[in-house]
Amino acid sequence: MIKFFLMVNKQGQTRLSKYYEHVDINKRTLLETEVIKSCLSRSNEQCSFIEYKDFKLIYRQYAALFIVVGVNDTENEMAIYEFIHNFVEVLDEYFSRVSELDIMFNLDKVHIILDEMVLNGCIVETNRARILAPLLILDKMSES
């Protein structure tokens, strides 16, 4: 099960955070700081899976952005690693080569995409067309 999903830039600034189980706001800040430090301090040659406290961190770097997913011990690391890539492919398709600015200025749409893919910490959809369908309908409605 996914515990949290973070998008962070190289400077350590959180661009998106989504928690699938309750974490107190003060603990979130500390958790994010430690998780970001753990991922940013690693070299490209090191593994993208980290054992951290009572869960695992799986991360991928895309240009200046890191996507970090915290999961429980029973989750398949490779499945989450590929899920991260699928998420970025969906963003690329919707935004035509997604950038950090796209995420910052369209955070609501990024949350919609993530919510279509993950429900209560479980991956429920990976098909790009079905993930983007609600957003495309919203876009058509806003044009009218």
Swiss-Prot record:
Subcellular location: Golgi apparatus, trans-Golgi network membrane
Chief localisation class: Golgi
Record has Transport as a keyword: yes
Statement: the UniProt record of this protein carries the keyword Glycosyltransferase: no
GO CC entries: AP-4 adaptor complex; endosome lumen; intracellular membrane-bounded organelle; trans-Golgi network; trans-Golgi network membrane
Record keywords: Golgi apparatus, Hereditary spastic paraplegia, Membrane, Neurodegeneration, Protein transport, Transport
CDD domains xref list: AP4_sigma (cd14832)
Single biological process term from Gene Ontology: vesicle-mediated transport
One Pfam match: Clat_adaptor_s
InterPro entries: AP_complex_ssu, AP_mu_sigma_su, Longin-like_dom_sf
UniProt note on tissues of expression: Widely expressed.
Entries under Gene3D superfamilies matching the protein: 3.30.450.60
Topology of this chain in the membrane: Peripheral membrane protein
Subunit structure: Adaptor protein complex 4 (AP-4) is a heterotetramer composed of two large adaptins (epsilon-type subunit AP4E1 and beta-type subunit AP4B1), a medium adaptin (mu-type subunit AP4M1) and a small adaptin (sigma-type AP4S1).
Family to which this protein belongs: Belongs to the adaptor complexes small subunit family.
Function recorded in the entry: Component of the adaptor protein complex 4 (AP-4). Adaptor protein complexes are vesicle coat components involved both in vesicle formation and cargo selection. They control the vesicular transport of proteins in different trafficking pathways. AP-4 forms a non clathrin-associated coat on vesicles departing the trans-Golgi network (TGN) and may be involved in the targeting of proteins from the trans-Golgi network (TGN) to the endosomal-lysosomal system.
Implicated disorder: Spastic paraplegia 52, autosomal recessive: A form of spastic paraplegia, a neurodegenerative disorder characterized by a slow, gradual, progressive weakness and spasticity of the lower limbs. SPG52 is characterized by neonatal hypotonia that progresses to hypertonia and spasticity, and severe intellectual disability with poor or absent speech development. Some patients may have seizures.
Protein name: AP-4 complex subunit sigma-1
Lineage: Eukaryota, Metazoa, Chordata, Craniata, Vertebrata
